[in-house]
Amino acid sequence: MSDSLSLIPHTPEWFARLKETLGEAACRQLGLFVIPPNWVLSVVIPVYNEKDHWQDLLARVRAVPLHKEIVIVDDCSRDGTRDQLQQFQAELQSAPADPWNKFQFVYHEKNRGKGAAVRTGFQAASGDVVIIQDADLEYDPSEYPRLLAPIIEGKADVVFGSRFLGDQPHRVLYFWHYLGNKFLTTLSNCFTNLNLTDMETCYKVMTREVLQKIAPTLRQERFGIEPEITAKVARHRFRVFEMSISYSGRTYDQGKKIGWRDGFKALYCIVRYGLCD
């Protein structure tokens, strides 16, 4: 088993050694799989006023043993985040080459919202699969391989990471947020004919083919991007999977940004994109 751990994860040699040690059935149960050579995951990270968190988040993203294109979009941060990012970008120029991680940095000249930052990141992304990653440490990048498995195995075009499935650890927080999320997800399901448990999740993973179909049509600037993406994925009848994820939610004192106005906007977007493109 120790020999298996010394190999590069998700390579044919790594998988063959684990299959020999654990058996094929156990490997499937554990979600172990082979990633094709030269395959790249684009990680789109919208950032706004996260000077105390983005570095920890980026360290976690970089540590995931996958070849990644990390697209960081600063949405005109005013707390020093932009200065930190630009310094980090400059340091990368003289740092040793990182075989696992390539970086792109995009800076908005005015604050436009998460949806606008995600759309900018989508335009810059060039990987085989794209995932959205918030910069606030609520979602755990170590779960990328689990989320990617249905796509790599050819079963799914899109994967949603659900905070309400399975037995992954969750921080217990606001009841009314939970209730609002369930209401919005249920209403979205009524319009899309999907049976999601967490439409508002940050973790939406999609193939390049899906991205090329829906990205040019996205319009929302703020948190309405979540129901808009969901509606357009459903309209194109892409194969959608849901996977359980952990969640460590923040309080408003810790920097949580979504508010009740965004809930009403999400309601509008569910109806709007449920009825027309």
Language-model features, listed with the residues they occupy:
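Catalytic donor-sugar/metal-binding loop of nucleotide-sugar-dependent glycosyltransferases
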Residues: L194-N195, R219-E221, T230-Y247
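Cell-envelope/extracellular polymer assembly enzymes that use nucleotide-activated donors
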Residues: V40-S42, E69, E228
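Acidic helix N-cap motif at the loop->helix transition within catalytic regions
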Residues: D52-D56, D79-Q89
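A conserved acidic beta->alpha catalytic loop
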Residues: D74-D83, L137
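Short beta-strand/loop segment that forms part of the nucleotide-sugar
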Residues: H67-S77, V106-H108
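Short aromatic/hydrophobic "clamp" motif used to bind/position activated sugar donors
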Residues: V130
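N-proximal low-complexity "stem/linker" segments adjacent to membrane-targeting elements
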Residues: M1-R60
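Acceptor/aglycone-binding surface of glycosyltransferases and processive sugar-polymer synthases
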Residues: N101-F103, H108-A124, P141-F223, S248-W260, ...
